[in-house]
């Protein structure tokens, strides 16, 4: 059985994790856009994306003080055991 690549696995969606974390912190896409020096439309686009570019994700992690890379690593480890 072929293992699905992260791009083929709809169960892991970084954009939805970002949206949920922003909501948990009571912050908005506009606030985050200001923190990472982009326009809000880029944040809304990230919400819809299963994956987010590493440079943007790094800035988002700093702004939210949340390690999304840890989420990616946990997903990778879970995939290894499946």
Give residue ranges: language-model regions.
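Short, basic-rich loop-to-helix N-cap that marks the start of a DNA-contacting helix
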Residues: 49-62
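Short alpha-helical "recognition helix" segments of helix-turn-helix
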Residues: 28-33
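Recognition helix of helix-turn-helix/homeodomain-like DNA-binding domains
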Residues: 37-52
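Short C-terminal boundary/hinge segments that cap the last helix of small helical domains
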Residues: 65-82
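A short, Lys/Arg-rich alpha-helix, primarily the initiator
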Residues: 1-27
């Amino acid at each position: 059985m072929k293992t699905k690549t992260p791009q083929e696995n709809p169960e892991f969606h970084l954009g939805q994790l970002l949206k949920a974390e922003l909501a948990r912190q009571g912050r908005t896409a506009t606030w985050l856009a200001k923190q990472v020096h982009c326009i809000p439309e880029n944040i809304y686009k990230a919400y819809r994306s299963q994956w987010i570019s590493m440079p943007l994700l790094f800035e988002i992690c700093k702004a939210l003080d949340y390690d999304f890379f840890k989420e990616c690593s946990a997903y990778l480890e879970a995939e290894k055991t499946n």
